[in-house]
From Swiss-Prot:
Binding-site positions, Mg(2+): D87, D129, K130, E451
Keywords carried by this UniProt record: 2Fe-2S, Amino-acid biosynthesis, Branched-chain amino acid biosynthesis, Iron, Iron-sulfur, Lyase, Magnesium, Metal-binding
A Gene Ontology BP annotation from the UniProt entry: isoleucine biosynthetic process
Identification of the protein by name: Dihydroxy-acid dehydratase
Keyword Flavoprotein carried by entry: no
Modification type N6-carboxylysine: residues: K130
Amino acid sequence: MIIVSTELNKISKRLTQDPSQPASQAMMYGAGFTDEDMKKPIVGIGSTGFDGNTCNMHLNILAGQVKGSITRGGMVGLGFNTIGVSDGISMGTEGMRFSLVSRDVIADSIETICEAHYYDALVTVVGCDKNMPGALIAMARLNRPSIMVYGGTIHSGHYKGEKLNIVSAFEALGKKVAGTITEEDYQGVIKNACPGAGACGGMYTANTMASAIEAMGLTLPYSSTAPATSEKKKAETLALGKAMMHLLEKDIKPRDIMTFEAFENAIRVILVLGGSTNAVMHLIAIAKAAGVKLTIDDFQRIGNTTPLLADLKPSGKYMMEDMDAIGGVPSVMRLLAKHNLLHLDCMTVTGKTVGENLKEAQDLPTDQDLMYAWENPIKQTGHLQILYGNLAPQGSVAKITGKEGTYFEGPARVYDSEEAVNKGLEANEVKSGEVIVIRYVGPKGGPGMPEMLKPTALLMGLGLGNECALITDGRFSGGTHGFVVGHITPEATEGGMIGLVKNGDIIRIDAVNRVLEVKISEEEVTKRRAAWVKPAPRATSGVLYKYMKLVSSASEGCVTDN
């Protein structure tokens, strides 16, 4: 039962109404508060906006629109910024080690300002991959009325009649190395892949997490698919004031929404849409912050009864803007509900349940081919497969859409860093039929568990994407496609079996039986383990050093507050 709250400023009044806090009040009056403002609820508006990348460059504008809506709704909106890392910019460089780290820095910084300044509620305006889980972790920790606004997806780029996206630019390098693209066309792809503001446009990590969070009920409906520069996105920001006041009046908090059943809804949606492997660790981390027990095995359990239906990039042909045109996530959720695969009684930030929200949505159109028919799916079960075996006794995450097959066996080609594998690919070291092993790039080994999009994109561009497999204790971008297995746990730096693999060892990847193993004898394992020496840490000070000391394994969500 939802109780109507009569004290909407019950947190901020510690500063605004307490006569023993004159200095607090003096500073607030100095910042422009009126006597009436001191009685109103204070809503923090946290933006990850910053210049120089398409995912985040417009977020401060959206945050300004949110602030206006909050003010008109009878509250005080206080804007603040936190950081972000552009995966697209840092990918393939040492800078990528800071990407996953940024998730926890975002969460910590939002928690810090909201706790220190006694905000009654929170709106987060976020864009790139780690922004969303960082914001949700903070919301769960704070447990004050909260809404996330997704910055929105980018529109497609175009060059010589071809639709482009950010992965087009990554894969163009492989084509250049292979000699299948001219320098002029290479530059043409680069300069036309990203036409303006918005997050990377396929079912990559940003759009995956936005879809998951909308399915959980922490955004307004259609937030995940509305393009960044659309009128629909602007309308979303202008609706925030009314929505937030309703949450405050009903005292609906994130943990009322972030139930185990809500996480199951989120997983179901990203599986049917073909979402990123990163969703596994991010949802586990968010669940931990919310006090919900979620494990990698829950993804497998749900995936066993969830078909892959969406023909979205990276493995398909459509973009998120196309998903928006056919009804967005609510229409997909209506389809799942018809097959009794959703929990419809979960609460959302609209103040209504999932089921009540879906009554206002439309069914998917019959004249579209983005979403396959239920009876004729792309894959009968989920594309995110949890593999175990002697290479991953604590689990790993494979992204198998079915287009690349379900079984691969071949000799290992081992690299101890992403830089080494990229050089090897550009030098044509990798041969058809091999399993590329990239290790010492896990959460502690990286440190920071960087994404391996550059090598997988090079493989695709070289024409080896369907002829090789790639396994790693690092991560993959949502833009990765091909026969790939990541999040191998334990990681090499922690003595994991992946650190003992040698060139030529036969590696077996069986997505049907969910097995990841290297075919060597126990005697050989014992011999190699005795000879193994833990490498020196790659960070000895600063944020990467702190992260390396605190971070948990990939299977546990890479959290830093265990």
